[in-house]
Amino acid sequence: MENRVMEFRKKHGYSQDKLAELLNVSRQTIISIEKGKYNPSLPLALNIAKIFNTIVEEIFLLEED
């Protein structure tokens, strides 16, 4: 799954530390999500979308076969 977390984070002026704090996760979790090494749980993905005031589908993109 591709994602645009880094793009949205920078657009909103958040550091990785600040986003992690807002989501109550570690900075390493944010790094792993941004690098595509970790797919967040549904609740975490929904919270990320809520923070950026958008829908999950705008941030997380399913890779086409």
Segments from the language model and where they lie:
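Short N-terminal alpha-helical targeting/association segments
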Residues: 1, 20, 26-29, 49-50
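Short basic helix-loop element that most often maps to the first helix and adjoining turn
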Residues: 3-22
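Short, Lys/Arg-enriched C-terminal cap helix and immediately downstream tail that follows
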Residues: 8, 42-43
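DNA major-groove recognition helix of helix-turn-helix/homeodomain DNA-binding modules
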Residues: 44-58
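Short, charged recognition helix plus adjacent turn
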Residues: 61-65
